[in-house]
A protein has these predicted regions:
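PP2C/PPM-type serine/threonine phosphatase catalytic domain
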Residues: 1-114
Length: 115
């Protein structure tokens, strides 16, 4: 599968977008896009932490039977990882919005959180 990525920082000083993707069993694929919340500190770190933890969780816990539940668990797991990151760097507030696509067998699962 060929993936093309494009991001634009717009009028902000820093681009807080993060994109990661990878394969899952049975010729499946996952793509996660996150965007750090500009009003919060370390938005770029939040975006990377959340995207990578979602991708890793789904790859490590892949299940053909219950993908919607795996996706929800991955988002919860990514929030836990973000809170650990926030504490480790001493930030008071970190966050990001999430969009993700999982292609598994003949199904495409789309999920988002935030605007």
């Amino acid at each position: 599968m060929t993936i093309y990525e494009y991001t634009n920082k717009g009028c902000r000083e820093e681009n807080q977008d993060y994109i990661c993707h990878g394969s899952i069993p049975d010729d499946g694929y996952i793509c996660v896009l996150t965007d750090g919340m500009g009003g919060y500190s370390s938005g770029n770190e939040a975006a990377k932490t959340v995207a990578e933890s979602i991708r890793e969780y789904i790859q490590d816990n892949y299940s053909k039977i219950d993908m919607p539940n795996i996706i929800n668990e991955a988002i919860t797991y990514s929030n836990d990882e973000l809170m650990l990151k926030r504490l480790s760097i001493g930030s008071k507030r970190m966050g990001c919005v999430i969009a993700l696509l999982v292609i598994a067998k003949e199904y495409a699962y789309i999920n988002w959180l935030g605007d």
